[in-house]
């Protein structure tokens, strides 16, 4: 899935390694940049491609973002396969991100997919509500916006499955304040958020209700509202149900009895 922070994690790895004293050579590529570097060197002839291979071989930690976009890349994949083997044989590290697991990747040599599968595969999960609230709080503080707790919960509940959307919301609020040529409220309340986002394409309009909370949570977790209302005990459904109940209590100020009736 997009917007979960895979690129941020790769850049954090590069930053952390760059700050250590072990003098490891770390290089971050987007898949398109990596392909372009290989294709450009291929077009410039044998000497240039050998020079590029030599440069890549001196890297200790190679980071490539969105590896799925290297599918059906022909010679680029062949060179990458040989580079991958070189890294394994020399105890170097490769970290890749993708929108799917190795066995779901199409357009790659089976040997390369096998190499991907041999490594540690970790799924980046959708942030839970507490993590999403912390992300909202962090992004707001960067631009000196002081959001009320209700405002943070509102943004996290409706947009917390995509960090890019959270950033977009914060940018929209900041821009609205600048556009109005007014000082930001000392504390930005939920009513202010609704005003700032009234023309925002992702923003749910109207009054917040239990049903709207269920709809948004169900969408974020890829399940139906009917599943939330059911007695099914599958882990993802239980988690979604608990998040919806939590938001109902926090945003709508419902007590336990009222939440029990709603769910």
Swiss-Prot record:
<dbReference type="InterPro" id="IPR013317">
    <property type="entry name" value="DnaA_dom"/>
</dbReference>
<comment type="subunit">
    <text>Oligomerizes as a right-handed, spiral filament on DNA at oriC.</text>
</comment>
<dbReference type="GO" id="GO:0005737">
    <property type="term" value="C:cytoplasm"/>
</dbReference>
<comment type="similarity">
    <text>Belongs to the DnaA family.</text>
</comment>
<feature type="binding site">
    <location>
        <position position="6"/>
    </location>
    <ligand>
        <name>ATP</name>
    </ligand>
</feature>
<keyword id="KW-0238">DNA-binding</keyword>
<dbReference type="GO" id="GO:0008289">
    <property type="term" value="F:lipid binding"/>
</dbReference>
<dbReference type="GO" id="GO:0005524">
    <property type="term" value="F:ATP binding"/>
</dbReference>
<dbReference type="InterPro" id="IPR010921">
    <property type="entry name" value="Trp_repressor/repl_initiator"/>
</dbReference>
<keyword id="KW-0446">Lipid-binding</keyword>
<protein>
    <recommendedName>
        <fullName>Chromosomal replication initiator protein DnaA</fullName>
    </recommendedName>
</protein>
<feature type="binding site">
    <location>
        <position position="3"/>
    </location>
    <ligand>
        <name>ATP</name>
    </ligand>
</feature>
<dbReference type="InterPro" id="IPR027417">
    <property type="entry name" value="P-loop_NTPase"/>
</dbReference>
<dbReference type="Pfam" id="PF08299">
    <property type="entry name" value="Bac_DnaA_C"/>
</dbReference>
<feature type="binding site">
    <location>
        <position position="5"/>
    </location>
    <ligand>
        <name>ATP</name>
    </ligand>
</feature>
<dbReference type="GO" id="GO:0006275">
    <property type="term" value="P:regulation of DNA replication"/>
</dbReference>
<keyword id="KW-0067">ATP-binding</keyword>
<dbReference type="GO" id="GO:0005886">
    <property type="term" value="C:plasma membrane"/>
</dbReference>
<feature type="region of interest" description="Domain I, interacts with DnaA modulators">
    <location>
        <position position="1"/>
    </location>
</feature>
<feature type="region of interest" description="Domain IV, binds dsDNA">
    <location>
        <begin position="178"/>
        <end position="263"/>
    </location>
</feature>
<feature type="region of interest" description="Domain III, AAA+ region">
    <location>
        <begin position="1"/>
        <end position="177"/>
    </location>
</feature>
<feature type="binding site">
    <location>
        <position position="7"/>
    </location>
    <ligand>
        <name>ATP</name>
    </ligand>
</feature>
<dbReference type="Pfam" id="PF00308">
    <property type="entry name" value="Bac_DnaA"/>
</dbReference>
<comment type="function">
    <text>Plays an essential role in the initiation and regulation of chromosomal replication. ATP-DnaA binds to the origin of replication (oriC) to initiate formation of the DNA replication initiation complex once per cell cycle. Binds the DnaA box (a 9 base pair repeat at the origin) and separates the double-stranded (ds)DNA. Forms a right-handed helical filament on oriC DNA; dsDNA binds to the exterior of the filament while single-stranded (ss)DNA is stabiized in the filament's interior.</text>
</comment>
<dbReference type="GO" id="GO:0006270">
    <property type="term" value="P:DNA replication initiation"/>
</dbReference>
<dbReference type="InterPro" id="IPR020591">
    <property type="entry name" value="Chromosome_initiator_DnaA-like"/>
</dbReference>
<keyword id="KW-0235">DNA replication</keyword>
<dbReference type="GO" id="GO:0003688">
    <property type="term" value="F:DNA replication origin binding"/>
</dbReference>
<keyword id="KW-0547">Nucleotide-binding</keyword>
<keyword id="KW-0963">Cytoplasm</keyword>
<dbReference type="InterPro" id="IPR013159">
    <property type="entry name" value="DnaA_C"/>
</dbReference>
<feature type="region of interest" description="Domain II">
    <location>
        <position position="1"/>
    </location>
</feature>
């Amino acid at each position: 899935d997009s917007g979960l922070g895979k690129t941020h994690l790769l850049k954090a790895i590069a930053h952390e390694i760059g700050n250590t004293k072990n003098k490891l050579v770390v290089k971050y590529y987007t898949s398109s940049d990596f392909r372009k570097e290989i294709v450009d060197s291929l077009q410039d002839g044998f000497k240039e491609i050998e020079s590029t291979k030599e440069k890549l071989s001196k890297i200790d930690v190679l980071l490539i973002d969105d590896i799925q976009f290297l599918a059906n890349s022909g010679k680029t994949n062949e060179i990458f396969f040989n580079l991958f083997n070189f890294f394994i044989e020399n105890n170097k590290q490769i970290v890749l991100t993708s929108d799917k697991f190795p066995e779901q990747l199409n357009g790659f040599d089976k040997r390369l997919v096998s190499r991907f599968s041999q490594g540690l595969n970790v799924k980046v999960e959708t942030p839970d509500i507490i993590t999403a609230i912390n992300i909202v709080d962090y992004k707001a503080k960067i631009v000196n916006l002081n959001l009320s707790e209700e405002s943070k919960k509102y943004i996290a509940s409706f947009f917390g499955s995509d960090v890019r959307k959270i950033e977009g919301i914060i940018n929209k609020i900041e821009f609205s304040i600048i556009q109005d040529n007014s000082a930001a409220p000392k504390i930005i309340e939920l009513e202010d958020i609704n005003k700032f986002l009234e023309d925002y394409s992702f923003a749910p309009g109207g009054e917040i209700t239990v049903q709207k909370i269920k709809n948004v949570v169900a969408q974020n977790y890829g399940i139906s509202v009917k599943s939330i209302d059911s007695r099914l005990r599958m882990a993802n459904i239980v988690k979604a149900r608990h998040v919806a109940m939590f938001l109902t209590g926090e945003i709508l100020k419902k007590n336990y009895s009222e939440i029990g009736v709603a769910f």
